[in-house]
Amino acid sequence: MILPAIVGIDCFDIARAHIIMDNAIAENHAAKCAVDCALHDLASKELGIPLYQMLGGKCRDSVSINRHIGIMDNVQAVSLAKDFVSQGFMSIKMKVGGNVQSNISRVRAVREAVGDDAKIRIDANAGYNYTQASEFVKGVYDCNVEYYEQLLPKWDIDQTVALHKNFGIPILLDEAVNTPEQAVRYAVSGAADAFTIKLCKCGGLYRAKQIAGIAEAFGMGIVVASTYDTHIGCGACLHLATALPNIQSACDLTTYASQKDIAKSCHVLNGMQLHAGDSYGIGVFSMNDFGMTVNNA
């Protein structure tokens, strides 16, 4: 439904493309993201510039990235954390959920293992209720957590505001903010300090810039995250993070997660820093370079 509606559109008419796509079908942000990123890539290649220049220019030469620790036993978590720090990654994102006391124990064990220099971010993926979240926050309050990401369900704005106010903790929202309208609602409420932007859940770079602008207007930070994308998707995220002024901490750009990819990136991973480079557009090599057949029909 989307592609037939935008056939023939100029690659520079990105705002118009979004109007057409939204009129053609509701939601389906991932599909709209694919079209949006393709248009941005083509337009910046037509101009002969890297994508980040089309998004407002370079705000930083490189983007810090973090590493993830899933829900596992303390021994495994500590081993992973030490390994990440030894590689130079000083920002660790820990997933939590299920038994609250087990999560508290794991976070405290990792904090003790990596010392005070490494940053620890918590992500509950909306898995706690207010009582559980309160118990967890009290249990790790002295662990110097950088962000508590989406502790509560995305619809529970009142309890999120209460958690933020009652504990004074830095809250990062992910699942709750998929659209500019949701960003306004949460920014006005004072429920959070920052938003996570994932291109596939907001509809692409055009909407992502709108959300980031709302956050900036309210003095809030942004974390750009990829969702185990190929180099194409992660590259678009990297260019966005390079261009946004309100990136205040490491981003979740999971370039290291792709085992088999449809493209090869020209971006440079140097320790915990990811560099967008100056190639035109997103900055990935054509699939044809690897002998793959592309169906242009």
Region spans (language model):
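Metal-dependent enolase-superfamily TIM-barrel catalytic cores that perform enediolate-based chemistry
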Residues: 56-167
